[in-house]
Amino acid sequence: MAITTITITTMSSTSSSSSSSCSSDSMMEDNIQCAEKIILKWKIDSHSHSTFVSIFHKNNTIEATLFLNSVSNLQRAMHFLSSNDKKSTNISIAQRSMQIAMKRLEKEFHQILLDYNHNRQHFISISNLRLIAETMISCGYAKECISVYKITRKSTIDEALSHLGILQYKHSHIKKMITAPDLQNHVKIWLNAFQIAIKTVFHEEKFLCDHVFSSYPTIRNLCFTNSTKEGALNLFTFPDLIVAICKRLKSDTLFVKVDLYNSISDQRPEIDSLFSHESISSVKLQAESCLQKLGDSVRTSAVLRRSELLASHLIHC
């Protein structure tokens, strides 16, 4: 009797487990099919010439939430089926739907970044960007997310710096500039651009990265580095070349170098804060190097000028 009871209990347990498994399978497959319908609704047609309409448009908040929830449900269903080694025809459907969804989110991410304006409803944009980034990263598409951010924001940063008058500085270019009568005008342009670049352009980019990738510190630092490092290093090329070329020139560039030194020195705390992470610390190191070189050059020029004035005074005496 005891044996019979044990056998019945075991069979009942097995039957219950099997029923539960079938129920879970069915639920996951339903989730995949429901997600597919919603995702296909927003599939990007590469051959279409119609105007792009964002899911995250102000009138589409319900659609955006529904889309992101569908992607999350799809990801959970895929994880369940793969972890339980389920050979389901819905796996291929899920994978295809996920690729379509990620392509859509890449486009949305790119478009919102292009339209991003720090002074106009930027908190809404940042919230949407963060939702997209977190969804893409959690679904295993971090590389694609980082790539879109880099391409879009680096272009925006470079354009902003160019608009301020920052050039791609070369030795030959600076040499001509120093010997030209309007050197002071070029320096004024750089000084103004430098202030805005540090206080506004790079500061706002740091703000954007910190909030969009708040849950992923490594990605946050990488994206800020990708978008700003090249432009920031080029920014400090100007004073660096001024010092190098001025070694052979007369000392009337003293006040130019003093202005450059004071400007960088004033922004030193902000520079140290913005470019503190190891991945972009080369910018901070270049700023320190510029200050050191400018300081040495100013002292040398001051001594030279003092000697010239003393010599001139002795001659007239």
Across the structure, where does each feature detected by a protein language model lie?
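Long amphipathic alpha-helical scaffold regions
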Residues: 1-193, 197-200
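Extended alpha-helical solenoid scaffold regions that build the rod-like backbones
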Residues: 174-317
